[in-house]
């Protein structure tokens, strides 16, 4: 009953159902048979089309049990949950630094290779990621494409808008696993955690004194 009767003429992979073979063959042909009636975009798989259509409908069926934030797809929820758990499963083979996302690790590894494949046509500055180049380019154009629907203030980066909107909503999605205190920004949580660990990562190049906060180091440097 487990015999696989339908084989791919390109790679030889076998399938029990003809429909499975048909879907698989699209990975070779590049055929995109599923069409979004809203925007005209095509997809290889029906599941990809359904996921895409949520952007049009606003449906976000995947909810974080920690903070209630909702997501269009399950993989984004899993990435978000790592912000609460602190899980960083992807480690750099060069320096050991760990990351929650593989894409962030891959971008980080270019620091070691020195590769900066995306360069600004205005000033020639190079960037590791294309999105960093796009953000940088707005410093030349002055474009601020992300407006706040509450107050109208505009931002050059989507993350700046997300952080700003928390000043309206009061949302604090980043919780300390030690004491439960919540923060609006992940960087504030990271800073807070140093109080539990006693870690002081900012050291004075003049005298070697260490500090838990960069602002404390900067204030200290003025004494030299």
Swiss-Prot record:
Concerning InterPro entries, the annotation shows:
Znf_C2H2-type (IPR050758), Znf_C2H2_sf (IPR036236), Znf_C2H2_type (IPR013087)
The UniProt entry, under Pfam families, shows: zf-C2H2, zf-H2C2_2
User: In which compartments does the protein localize?
Assistant: Nucleus
* Key words of the record: DNA-binding, Metal-binding, Nucleus, Repeat, Transcription, Transcription regulation, Zinc, Zinc-finger
User: Annotated Gene Ontology MF terms?
Assistant: DNA binding; zinc ion binding
Name the protein family.
Answer: Belongs to the krueppel C2H2-type zinc-finger protein family.
The protein depicted here goes by the name: Oocyte zinc finger protein XlCOF6.1
